[in-house]
């Protein structure tokens, strides 16, 4: 059987180990070829090929439900659930998603993009199953660092308290998240990897004991206590943590040995109550370059399969915002030992790996634990440090209570640096950084800013470090800057709450925030070609808003347009409209940004065009709103 013939995972039933191994090779080939051509996540999926095949051969997927954590592990799952012929559309507009979406396929039982959600979801399904009197297996596959997330531990704590609820948790332990795992839990799991299989000892000890003449049967009542003692000898001195939490622990199992995996899963299905199967895998398995560089090959842009090197673009690009951010932060940290960079398992993505390499004592990686990262930063701030929490916009959502309760209510000087703010592209709706303006703007005490380009971002990094009155946040986008000149030192902080006028005109006031400032200027030039002259403001700050600049100009010009790369509901445009109403300035305000929709996976340019956020579309929308007679000139 060839992989292309598999349209339903139950077709794996009855296949021999040799046939499954052939399917495994074909999955890796297809996975590698697709990611090499189009980009995507590489290492996580390559590491779970045998795990997926072994697990699915022991389940009835017409009935049983498998919940995958951090959906980028699930590329093999997609390939054996009817998406082989569409796999070349991975992460592309109108193609299949890079993560899991309930609406994409009947075997995607729960959406996944952020980490640590699978056990909670699977437990909820298991409880509903029991309440409804149904019969199916609920399985959570968690790994790639997700077990370090507090939500996963909360779910384990709950599930372990339900001894009659059948739940299978499969731990894909590849010793990594995106970067190497950090913390006590990964260290404990590493010790478990080196220990003999616990379940084997428990099961075989009793069988061997009973064969001792005259003694075995008579001491049978004591076997339980003896087995518990043997179990503790078989695992690290930390104790059989999962067993103590109410789970039957099995493993560690070789995650690339199909015979061992199938036998273990078959045995696990026979055990009542919550079970955890610990599977030791190699991230990037089957592609030598990915096995050697598990961080670099976690996810890739298009690359040459032979050399492993990224395919160069046709023209050189300006530096990425994240690179400029990290370079500037390192320069400042070299001069100020109180600056502490904090990441939640995203050192490479945020650029804080550069701080780690240069100043390791001024760097903290907390693992996939955004809530802890924020309150840790608050504690550092209490003692006079300058914590810089570099967290993707989409992941900071997970620490909302901590932002309010632990930082803003106490007015602590934590500097939040929100990478990947705005439209992020092929990762899709789970990763779009659309909401941070709205969800932060309503919190007292916080200052919020966004740079128009990479040079202004350097000044904002200095501003954030020097602002010690309370919390401050800077959002910046994924991708490259504009190529403007950068400075190596001597950056001046910005005045808090002050914007700047970039262009003067009497017909319309355009106020851009962050990444939409340059499109504002471009739209103004297009409008000028049609006889419409715009004043353009770079707001710089949404909180506090520069009302001294904006309100008089709005009153004078009488037509206002706001531009933002974020949700318009409660966003920057709402802040401007509220300020004008509060000042009793009643003028029309056209808010342009991301409407009340989910932005699906596509390139950022494709998404912006679909949302009407290109400079030409902006000019057209301004003309439609305020200068109707001239619309046809642009169309």
Curated annotation (Swiss-Prot):
PROSITE patterns the UniProt entry points to: TRANSKETOLASE_1, TRANSKETOLASE_2
GO BP term (any one): thiamine biosynthetic process
Keyword tags: Isoprene biosynthesis, Magnesium, Metal-binding, Thiamine biosynthesis, Thiamine pyrophosphate, Transferase
EC number annotated for this UniProt entry: 2.2.1.7
Binding site for Mg(2+): 144, 174
SUPFAM superfamilies the UniProt entry points to: Thiamin diphosphate-binding fold (THDP-binding), TK C-terminal domain-like
Recorded family membership: Belongs to the transketolase family. DXPS subfamily.
Quaternary state and interactors: Homodimer.
HAMAP family in UniProt: DXP_synth
Official protein name in the record: 1-deoxy-D-xylulose-5-phosphate synthase
Organism: Trichormus variabilis (strain ATCC 29413 / PCC 7937) (Anabaena variabilis)
Lineage: Bacteria, Bacillati, Cyanobacteriota, Cyanophyceae, Nostocales
Name of the encoding gene: dxs
């Amino acid at each position: 059987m060839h992989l292309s013939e598999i349209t339903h995972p139950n077709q794996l039933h009855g296949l021999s180990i040799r046939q499954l191994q052939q399917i495994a090779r074909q999955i890796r080939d297809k996975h590698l070829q697709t990611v090499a051509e189009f980009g995507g996540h590489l290492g996580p999926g390559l590491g779970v090929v045998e795990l997926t095949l072994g697990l699915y051969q022991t389940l009835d997927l017409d009935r049983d439900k498998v919940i995958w954590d951090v959906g980028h592990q699930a590329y093999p799952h997609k390939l054996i659930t009817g998406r082989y012929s569409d796999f070349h559309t991975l992460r592309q507009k109108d193609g299949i998603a890079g993560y899991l979406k309930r609406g994409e396929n009947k075997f995607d039982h729960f959406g996944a993009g952020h980490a640590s959600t699978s056990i909670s979801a699977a437990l909820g399904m298991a409880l509903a199953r029991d309440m409804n009197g149904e019969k199916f297996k609920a399985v959570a596959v968690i790994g790639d660092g997700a077990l370090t997330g507090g939500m996963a531990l909360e779910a384990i704590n709950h599930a372990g308290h339900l001894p009659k609820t059948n739940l299978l948790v499969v731990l894909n332990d590849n010793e990594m998240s995106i970067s190497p795992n950090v913390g006590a839990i990964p260290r404990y799991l590493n010790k478990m990897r080196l220990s003999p299989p616990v379940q084997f000892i428990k099961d075989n000890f009793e069988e061997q004991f009973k064969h001792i003449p005259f003694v075995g049967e008579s001491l049978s009542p004591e076997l339980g206590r003896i087995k518990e003692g043997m179990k503790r000898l078989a695992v690290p001195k930390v104790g059989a943590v999962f067993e103590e939490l109410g789970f039957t622990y099995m493993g560690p199992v070789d995650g690339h040995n199909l015979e061992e995996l199938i036998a273990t899963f078959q045995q696990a299905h026979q055990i009542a109550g919550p079970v955890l199967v610990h599977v030791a895998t190699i991230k990037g398995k089957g592609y030598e370059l990915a096995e050697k560089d598990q961080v670099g090959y976690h996810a890739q842009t298009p690359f040459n399969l032979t050399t492993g090197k990224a395919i160069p673009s046709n023209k050189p690009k300006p530096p990425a915002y994240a690179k400029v951010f990290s370079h500037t932060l390192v320069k400042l940290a070299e001069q100020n030992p109180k600056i502490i960079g904090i990441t939640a398992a995203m050192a490479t993505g945020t650029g804080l790996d550069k701080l780690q390499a240069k100043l390791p004592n001024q760097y903290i990686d907390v693992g996939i634990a955004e809530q802890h990262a924020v309150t840790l930063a608050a504690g550092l701030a209490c003692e006079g440090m300058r914590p810089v929490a570099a967290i993707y916009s989409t992941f900071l959502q997970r620490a909302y209570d901590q932002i309010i309760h632990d930082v803003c209510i106490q007015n602590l000087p934590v500097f939040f640096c929100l990478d990947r703010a705005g439209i992020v592209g092929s990762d899709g709706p789970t990763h779009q950084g659309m909401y941070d303006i709205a969800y932060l703007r309503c919190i007292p005490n916080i200052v919020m800013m966004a740079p128009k380009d990479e040079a202004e971002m350097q000044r904002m990094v200095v501003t954030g470090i020097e602002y010690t009155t309370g919390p401050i946040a800077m959002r910046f986008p994924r991708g490259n800057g504009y190529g403007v000149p950068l400075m190596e030192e001597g950056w001046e902080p910005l005045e808090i709450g002050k914007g700047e006028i970039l262009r003067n005109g009497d017909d319309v006031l355009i106020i851009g925030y962050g990444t939409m400032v340059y499109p504002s200027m471009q739209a103004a030039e297009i409008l000028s070609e049609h006889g419409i002259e715009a004043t353009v403001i770079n707001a710089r700050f949404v909180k506090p808003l520069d009302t001294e600049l904006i309100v008089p100009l709005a009153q004078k010009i009488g037509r206002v347009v706001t531009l933002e790369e974020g949700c318009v509901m409660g966003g920057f445009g709402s802040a401007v409209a509220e300020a004008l109403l509060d000042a009793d300035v009643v003028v029309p305000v056209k808010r342009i940004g991301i409407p009340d929709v989910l932005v699906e996976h596509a390139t950022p340019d494709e998404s912006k065009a679909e949302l009407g956020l290109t400079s030409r579309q902006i000019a057209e929308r301004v003309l439609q709103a305020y200068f109707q007679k001239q619309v046809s000139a642009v169309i």
